[in-house]
Regions:
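N-terminal interaction/assembly modules
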Residues: 1-158
């Protein structure tokens, strides 16, 4: 049971990192303020579910603060390189400026984690962000996220 809670805390840290990167992108709020809000539970921490035809929010287990901080810090420090990697991975049909903001933030956080964490196996990181993508999208974004994160992992880790 403790292992399951630990996995959930890592999953929620990744989701919170995506939410923080998204909040910064949308509101240009100071990174430190956003991260403090994330660590205090003022940002994220809930999921929208549907039960008996009505939507409701449910609390999520606490995010792992260490992973959350490492991923957001890695994005902050490597944002230009990460965004350039995303740009160069796109096909002619998809431009960087037309990417859905949520999808872009999932890619950013996933790529940042490769900078932040050299210990976790690449397939685990890729799977976590593909699952996050799947929770928001049903289309080609899932395959695109998988391919881009896999390619990026090989560039960063060799």
């Amino acid at each position: 049971m403790a292992e399951n809670n630990s996995k959930l805390s890592f999953t929620n840290a990744r989701l919170l990192a995506v939410q923080t990167i998204y909040a910064h992108m949308m509101g240009d709020e100071d990174w430190n303020k956003l991260m403090s809000r994330g660590l205090l539970g003022e940002l994220g921490g809930k999921a929208l579910t549907e039960e008996n035809g009505s939507e409701k929010y449910v609390a999520l287990p606490a995010a792992d603060a260490g992973l959350y901080t490492r991923v957001v810090d890695a994005y902050r420090e490597n944002a230009e390189d990460i965004d350039n990697a995303i740009r160069t991975s796109l096909t002619e049909k998809i431009s960087f400026d037309r990417l859905d903001p949520t999808f872009l933030c999932i890619l950013r956080a996933g790529m940042a984690e490769f900078y932040a964490d050299s210990e976790t196996a690449a397939p685990i990181i890729i799977n976590e962000y593909v699952d996050l993508t799947r929770s928001f999208y049903e289309g080609s974004e899932i395959k695109i996220a998988n391919a881009m994160l896999d390619r990026f992992s090989k560039v960063i880790r060799g």
